Each structure stands twice: as C-alpha cells, then as structure tokens.
Amino acid sequence: MRVATWNVNSVKKRLPRLLVWLDERRPDVVCLQETKLADAAFEQLLGAELAARGYACALHGDGQWNGVAILSRVGLDDVVVGLPGAPGFPEPEARAVSASCDGVRVHSVYVPNGREPGSEHYRYKLAWLAALRENLRADTREALVCGDMNIAPTDDDVFDPAAYVGQTHVTPAERAALAELQDQGLHDVVREHWPAQRVFTYWDYRAGMFHRDLGMRIDLVLASGSLAERVRAAWVDRQARKGQGPSDHAPVICDLDEAPDGDIGPVVPPPSAPLLKRGVATTPQGAPRS
C-alpha cells in the first residue's frame, strides 16, 4: 500500500497538478492539508475526477483557511472529522480527519503554525498537539499519522539551525511536544529510513529557497510499530515541488509491504544545487507563516 501526505496549499490552486500527480504516483491513500475549501466546494471541484480514479474522500474543510482530507481507494471506514478535545482559536478549526483504510488507522493532520514563540498562537499549537497525543494514546489501533506538523524534529531537519534561532518550528517546547507524540509508539519513517541524509519537505517561495535547497523537514509520516516494520520505501517527491504553480511543500510517500519504484530516496530527484555549509548563508526567509 502506498500512502502519501501533501500540504497542497490550496486544492483549487494546485489543479491540475494534483490530478497529474495522482496519475503518476498512484498512491492508495493520500492525506491532504491546507485544502482551503469547504467540503461541498471540494466535492464539486474534485469529486467526479477522484471517483473516476477510484478514490473515496473524507473531508474536513472550512473554506478559506486550513482544511484536511483523506483520499482512499482501499476502503474508507469509521471516519472521524475533527480532533476530539482539541482547543479552538477560538472555535475548532479544520485541522484533523481520520479513517480506517485497508485495516490501517490513518490520520491527516495540519498542526497549527504557532507564529511567534510565547504568543497566543504558540500556546494554541502546544495545546492542540497535546490533544492529538491524548487521542492517539486512547486509541490502540495501528496507525499512520500523516501531515504538516509545522515542527522540524531536530537541527538536522533545517538547512541552517542558526538561521532559525528565535523562530517557531524549532523551539524546545515544540520539539518536546512532537517527541511526546512519537512516544506513543510512533516512528518517523523517513528519518529512520534515511538517518544521515539531508531531507527537506518545505521551501519558502521567496529568494530561490527551493533551487538552493534551503528548506525544512516539517511534513512527516509517523507509523506505529508493526506498520513501521512494513515500510519498504519512504521518500520525498521533490519533483512535485518543481515547475509552475507548485505548493511550497513536497509530498512525502511511504510504501508498505512492497515498493513499486524500488527503495528510492530520500529525495526524488535529488537537489542539483551544492549543499549549503551550515553557518554560511543565514537570514532565511522564515518558517511557514500560516
């Protein structure tokens, strides 16, 4: 089973790229974030195209902001929209949806950005992560937690740690919250598969960050123990970040039981630009802002 997660940064803006990508990569399950469409609008825009490709959809959107979805062609059962017990800002936001796909509990999550350390948004982010952790703790089913975590797990997951000092996505409290989430028996499949390689999933649109490979790894697939053992390939589809009108995130792909493209990765295709030496080019254009 091929599972992918992708922050598309607006489904409407990503058409027809999304459909072309589905046809090329043929994932069985897709977790989308930042769909930025109400459910009815999503169905009107994509329902027929997805049905023709064999996908059923679990949607949780609220229009202009946020929005998550699960697309599955291997079953879509026991759908839960939202995150029980999660705080709102001030109302609950469309940041989580889960479903069972071919016997696997799949969660598509879009963790709040946090904006500025110590701010109200930052406290909301930490509280939301705590609610996610408690939901996973209470559910003993084997699970894949997929999505935009808006946290780089370690300094190895940013192009230059010194450039992000004082910003969100890298603070000790955020990383501790992510570690506590993983303490529920979840494995970061890309990092476990590629422990020493330079791997990013997000590059700011500005200042040629993508072409210079100045990014962050904030989009993760976290797998519970027995599922992690089934992983045959785990990689970032950098090709989807190229060309005209891309999302600022690349999809992350995880193959269970068999790998149709072989054990490729960690980034496909690899960056062509020379690697940046840490501490040389600082002043990033910043972590994601929404």
Over which residues does each language-model region extend?
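Surface-exposed cleft-lining segments at the edges of enzyme active sites
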Residues: P84-P87, V111-L129, A162-Q167
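Conserved beta strand-loop-helix elements of the APE1-like EEP
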Residues: Q64-V79, M209-R230, L256-D257
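Metal-dependent phosphoesterases centered on the DNase I-like endonuclease/exonuclease/phosphatase
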Residues: L46, A51-R53, W128-I218, P271, ...
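Active-site environment of divalent metal-dependent phosphoester hydrolases
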Residues: K13, L37-A40, P117, A152-P153, ...
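N-terminal, active-site-proximal structural segment of metallo-dependent hydrolase catalytic domains
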Residues: M1-A56, G63-V68, D263-K277, A281-S290
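Structured beta-strand-rich core segments of catalytic domains in phosphoester-bond hydrolases
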Residues: K36-A38, F42-E116
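Active-site beta-strand/loop signature of hydrolases that rely on acidic residues for catalysis
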Residues: V3-N7, L22-F42, V106, L132, ...
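Short proline/glycine-enriched turn/loop segments at secondary-structure junctions
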Residues: M209-H211, A240-P246
